[in-house]
UniProtKB/Swiss-Prot annotation:
GO terms for biological process: response to hydroperoxide. Belongs to the UPF0246 family. Pfam families: H2O2_YaaD. This is UPF0246 protein FP0718. GO terms for cellular component: cytosol. It comes from Flavobacterium psychrophilum (strain ATCC 49511 / DSM 21280 / CIP 103535 / JIP02/86).
Amino acid sequence: MKIVISPAKSLDFEKTLPNNQFTKPAYLKQSKEIVSVLNKLNPKELSELMHISDNLAQLNWQRNKNFTTPFTTQNARPAIYTFNGEVYNGLDSYSIAEEKLAVLQNKLRILSGQYGILKPLDLMQAYRLEMGTHLPINEHKNLYSFWKEIVTNDLNKELKNNELFVNLASNEYFSVIDTKKLKVPIITPEFKDYKDEKLKIISFFAKKARGLMVRYIIDNDIETLDGLKGFNYEGYSFDANLSKGNTLVFTR
């Protein structure tokens, strides 16, 4: 099984790491190309490009200037212990037992505007670059064009025939994958909560549930569709009536 998730805007470079394991990202050459383009922009231009405040633009301008290779444990940090949004709160990577890290590293992939695709223990430096940012890179009109073939080929190399491929990423990030060229079907879980007596996708809860499902898969080393349907963390359960085809709906 392979799982893809989105990155997070919020980053944590302060918390003490639970172990000293790390790997190197596969596409640093491409990341350097992107940063070299970003480094031609001043903070005001970054603010306009990314639709962010002047303060955030200044911070990310400095991050781009600080980008340096090779990545080491002194200047970078494993992605899974750095991203810090709701998905990652649900996953709670710091409490994953060290003997489960190999399962996590094998199954999970993080899509990224700056790094393309990351394994959990891949080192990363601080950045902010959403996949939907309209940033031309050389002959590519945007980041989707720049990364699509690279990310799709990377996944296809790893995916075995009949292996489950689980999409727990947002549409913004999942769109970087050329799904027509993927050699396996895509399983897309959805998470709905009752609100005002109606079932709805509530963004805050749905994001956390994506992380919870990753954690469920890792905890139980899930490999099958039936195993996936058994997801029951924090009150969710599979709803066969609402599910259709490869879209699995979980409600609570």
